[in-house]
């Protein structure tokens, strides 16, 4: 058994990130679900879908929830789920974070959450660009 993974984001971010990570790794070693929150969709309906996903994903080791922006609706839904289920929430999802998690499917939920944060942080770089000669 491993930790389940639920991505809750605005619009098509979760699906796009998950599909890209799967293509890059040629596999997806964790049970995952993507849930998008349209701007005009009733929160109660999204919450019901999220609870169904949690019930499917949690095989006894909990569910790591990744959201896009802390304080926005997807993260608020995630926070509520953490109050009701065995979940951990990490906000600020990016592709390096997701790839890092999928490379360590054997971790417990606490260590996976820490790996998510380090992967997301390490994947953000200020790149120096040199002018090219004309």
Task: List PLM regions with ranges.
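N-terminal loops that bind phosphate or other acidic moieties
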Residues: 2-64, 69-134
